[in-house]
Each structure stands twice: as C-alpha cells, then as structure tokens.
C-alpha cells in the first residue's frame, strides 16, 4: 500500500524538485515555481546566492527558524530549506493568484486604471488581511521590513498572504515582546522605506512596517509608490527632506483619485507620519473606519482574480531546461538563461547551447521599483568607523569658525581611481569631473573643508559617500544623507551649486543645531 504523499515530510533532496518558470527575482535571489514529486505538489522555491548574500549562514539559519515558526493564514507557509552548491533553497507554498503587483501591472497595461487602479472595497479587503498578518508578526517580535504590493500574494480562493521574499526581512526576538526590538539594518525598497530606516540613527521598530503599509495603500490606488519615477538616492532625499507623501504625490491626472474618500486618505496620513511613535499599530489600524469597507475572500476571488494575469502570463521562461543547479542570469530582453560555467562545453548539452543564438549578458541592476541597488536585500549592517575623524586635525577647544582644508586621500578618491582604471584607453567619452567641497565639523567641533572630484558616468553618489566614510572623513551614520545631496548636485549642477542639509549623526551633548554655523549640519558645494 503506497504511502499518502501528504503525510511525507518535505524533501531536502534537490532531485525531488523539478524547476519550472521564473516568477520573481531580486539582487541576490531568484524565485521559481517547481514541482515536488514525492509530495505531488507545486511549490515556490527561492534560490539565494550565498556568495552575494552578505548575511552569515548562522544569521540566515536563525531567520529561517523564525520563518518556520510562523503559522498564520495571512503569512505564506514555509516548508523546508537546504543548500545546493552555493545556493540556499527555500521551499514555500505557491499561491497561483500571483502578487497584487501582478494585478496592478495587468490593469494598467489594459488601460483600466483611469479612475484608479483598485476600488476602495478591494483595497480595504486586501489591506485588512495584510494588517492581520502584520499584527501576528509584530506580536511575535518580528518586523517584515519590505511590505509592498509585490510581496502581497493571492491564492486562487481569494486568500491574501504576505510573502517574505527578502528572506532576512524576519528578525526574531525569540517571541519575547519585552526585548529591545530596535534594528539598525538597512533593508527594504527605497520607495516604501520609512525615514527612520533610511537615517539609521536611532534604529527602528515595528512602526517601519506601518509606513511601508501606507505607501502600499497609495500603490494599490494609483498603481505606483509616490516617488517611483526617481532614482534611489533621490527617493531617499525626498523622503527625508519633504513632508510625508499623500495620495496625490506624483500623480499627474488627479481625476483618477476622485473616487477615493476621506477615510482612505486619513488612514494613509496616519501611517505616513515621520515620527514613528505617532503611527498607529497594526491592531489599532484594524479598527479604523476605512476597513469597514472590507469584504470576504469570495469577493476578491470574483472581482480581483478575474482581472489577474495567469501564472503562464506572469512567468519568465528559462531558455535552457535546468538539468543542474546552475546559476540563472537575466538577459537584456528580460529572459533567463543558465550560466555557461555550470556545464561541460564538450557535452551534447553544451554543444547544443553554444550553437544557439543567445542574448547578451547584462550587469545586474535592479530598478528602483525592486531593490536598493547598492544594498543587498538580505540585510547588510552599515559599519560606523570607530575613529570617525582619524584623518582630521584633532586640536581641543571650542567650535572653530575657520574651516581646515582636507582632501580625500588619492587612494580613496573615486575620480582618480576611475582615471587609473581607464589610463591608456584613449577614450574620448570621458566626462569632465565636478570639483566639490563638503564642509562639516569633525568630532572635535572643528570646521573642515573636504575637497574631492566626482566624474559623471564613472562615479556614483553612494560610492563617493562610502569612500568619504572609509577615509574617516564622514561619520558612517551620514552615508545616506551625504549621498542623497551629492546626487542632487550632480544631477542638476547648474541649479544646485550649493546645498545645506541636516546630518543624521546629529549634535553632541548640549550643542544646539545651527544650519548657519553648520552645527549638526553640512554644506556641499561645487568649487
């Protein structure tokens, strides 16, 4: 008598899974549908490249343990995990309805979004289920950290579940709600990211998810996050320096917003308060008037899933049948290929693959609507140098009024590095470097001028900011804000020749912030 497949434990043998279409991708991972033969069930497998993942295996295992302990109807079920070569495979439940983002894209592509993408009843129904899932996570001492439409999945029965496709978005506190639950890990997607996550000064807690939830509410109505058109550093700058976004932010055709009422707008504004302490909890939001409009899953099944693309429409086909655990590469045309270094070129498979016309490889780059490009989605902790001002003059005394001249060391200067790499190439396309001065105070309260060059097309704002930190010239906590303002200047140097901005590192002791004297502030100028 054959054993009931449902009673079998989930296999940790790679050969028991037949990999199928690619249904999602990020900077360090690919999500594929797969068929588990022993269980006779289709699943989703997230394949994490451990070489790119900067989180230690110990930390990953802790997070997987936290995922395995999540049992809630609004959280995607985790089945098992195992290592295949240099990849960690996470086996999870496959929801055939796809993500809410898939539905949004489908509606927009068909031009059915002129009066708003989803109606209030649909939004309320989806978001109420998301809140139920978030309330469960938060009560169990976990922060999701990447709430957005792309991580909200639908089952064929109209059920709604939060996916954790960021893997380490879960950080367990051992279920002890009394423990310190403040994180300082830079994880998430810029458009949905809370200001306190960007600043990394005081850390953040569960309220970061509430901000992302508010942005997601806007996304479900308008089809996109408020700052989706801007590059990542611009998003960071707008989020930190502007008033919180609203339903109207970034929307050109205001007609599409007319059907959205006061309770919806009020709910969004409650979530998008810059002070996290003023944001409601998930439990408090569930009692908000707007969610009285929510209906049941049969409503979603009938009204929303009928407008959703099928799994075959969503899927990205793989050019070669995956016969091994080779690496996948995204190509210029959006397709997927298995890497050539995973098979024998003299084999029949190798000869066949080489003889085929293949799309050119492209460097990995993730759009702003997906992931922060220079930050691994599996949380990288920003390291603040122990001696922030090691390379700066250190005399004792009161706040200085005249700046000390400091240059970025040649070994760390991005423009010089780029020139060294291209020396002898004879390229005529080299852009003229922009000479800049960053004026700020060191830990001894001395005013310093840090001079450096930025070469458009070669340097990046993030890279230069990191070089300044590595050289001990800038506090590590100011990485984001310095990069954001540098990006602002190099994008429009004619209109932004000088900017003064508040530093995330703040002021020491009894000092009072002063933008004129640059106490707690910095000034970046074109010299």
Curated annotation (Swiss-Prot):
It comes from Homo sapiens. Changing residue 185 to E/D: Mimics phosphorylation; promoting kinase activity independently of WNK kinases. Changing residue 448 to A: Decreased interaction with WNK4. Its EC number is 2.7.11.1. GO terms for cellular component: cytoplasm; cytosol; extracellular exosome. ATP binds at residues 23-31, 46. Keywords: Acetylation, ATP-binding, Cytoplasm, Kinase, Magnesium, Metal-binding, Nucleotide-binding, Phosphoprotein, Serine/threonine-protein kinase, Transferase. One of its GO terms (biological process) is response to xenobiotic stimulus. The modification Phosphothreonine is found at residues 185, 310. GO terms for molecular function: ATP binding; identical protein binding; ion channel regulator activity; magnesium ion binding; potassium channel inhibitor activity; protein kinase binding; protein serine kinase activity; protein serine/threonine kinase activity. The keyword ATP-binding applies. Changing residue 468 to F: Abolished interaction with WNK4. Residues 17-291 form the Protein kinase domain. The modification Phosphoserine is found at residues 324-325, 339, 347, 359, 427. Changing residue 473 to A: Abolished interaction with SLC12A2/NKCC1 and WNK4. The modification N-acetylserine is found at residue 2. It catalyses: L-seryl-[protein] + ATP = O-phospho-L-seryl-[protein] + ADP + H(+); L-threonyl-[protein] + ATP = O-phospho-L-threonyl-[protein] + ADP + H(+). The active site is at 146 (proton acceptor). The keyword ATP-binding applies. This is Serine/threonine-protein kinase OSR1. Disulfide bonds: none annotated. Belongs to the protein kinase superfamily. STE Ser/Thr protein kinase family. STE20 subfamily. Residues 334-348 have a biased composition (Acidic residues). SUPFAM superfamilies: Protein kinase-like (PK-like).
């Amino acid at each position: 008598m054959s054993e009931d497949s449902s009673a079998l434990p989930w296999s940790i043998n790679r050969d028991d899974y037949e990999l199928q279409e690619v249904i999602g991708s990020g900077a360090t991972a690919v999500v594929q549908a797969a068929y588990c033969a022993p269980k006779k069930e289709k699943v989703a497998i997230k394949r994490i490249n451990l070489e790119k993942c900067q989180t230690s295996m110990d930390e990953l295992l802790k997070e997987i343990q936290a995922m395995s302990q999540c049992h809630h109807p609004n959280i995607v079920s985790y089945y098992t995990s195992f290592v295949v070569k240099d990849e960690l495979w996470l086996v999870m439940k496959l929801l055939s309805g796809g993500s809410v983002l898939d539905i949004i894209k489908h509606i927009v592509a068909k031009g059915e979004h002129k009066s708003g993408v989803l109606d209030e009843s649909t939004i309320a129904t989806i978001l109420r289920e998301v809140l139920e899932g978030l309330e469960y996570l938060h009560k169990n001492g976990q922060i999701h950290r990447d709430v957005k439409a792309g991580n909200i999945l639908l089952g064929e029965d109209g059920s709604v579940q939060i996916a954790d496709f960021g893997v380490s978005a879960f950080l367990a506190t051992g279920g002890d709600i009394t423990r310190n639950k403040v994180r300082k890990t830079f994880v998430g997607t810029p458009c949905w990211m809370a200001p306190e996550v960007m600043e990394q000064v005081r850390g953040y807690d569960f309220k970061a998810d509430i901000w992302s939830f508010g942005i997601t509410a806007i996304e479900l109505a308008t089809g996109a996050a408020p700052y989706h058109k801007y590059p990542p550093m611009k998003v960071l700058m707008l989020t930190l320096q502007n008033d919180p976004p609203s339903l109207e932010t970034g929307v050109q055709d205001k007609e599409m917003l007319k059907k959205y009422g006061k309770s919806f707008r009020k709910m969004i504004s409650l979530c998008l308060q810059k002070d996290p302490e003023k944001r409601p909890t998930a439990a408090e939001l569930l009692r908000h008037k707007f969610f009285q409009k929510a209906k049941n899953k049969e409503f979603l099944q009938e009204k929303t899933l009928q407008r959703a693309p099928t799994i075959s429409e969503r899927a990205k086909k793989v050019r070669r049948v995956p016969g091994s655990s080779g690496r996948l590469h995204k190509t210029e045309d959006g397709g997927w290929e298995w890497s050539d270094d995973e098979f024998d070129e003299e084999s029949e498979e190798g000869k066949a693959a080489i003889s085929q016309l293949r799309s050119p490889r492209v460097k990995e780059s993730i759009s702003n609507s997906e992931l922060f490009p220079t930050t691994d989605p599996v949380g990288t902790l920003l390291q603040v140098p122990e001696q922030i001002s090691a390379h700066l003059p250190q005399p004792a005394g009161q706040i200085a009024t005249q700046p000390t001249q400091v240059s970025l060391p040649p070994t760390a200067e991005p423009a010089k590095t780029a020139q060294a790499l291209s020396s002898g190439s004879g390229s005529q396309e080299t852009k003229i470097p922009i000479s800049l001065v960053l004026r700020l105070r060191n830990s001894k309260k001395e005013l310093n001028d840090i001079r450096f060059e930025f070469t458009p097309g070669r340097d990046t704002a993030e890279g230069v900011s990191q070089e300044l930190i590595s050289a001990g010239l800038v506090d590590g906590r100011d990485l984001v804000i310095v990069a954001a303002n540098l990006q602002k200047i190099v994008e429009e140097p004619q209109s932004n020749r000088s900017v003064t901005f508040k530093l995330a590192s703040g002021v020491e002791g009894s000092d009072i912030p002063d933008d004129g004297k640059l106490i707690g502030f910095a000034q970046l100028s074109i010299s």
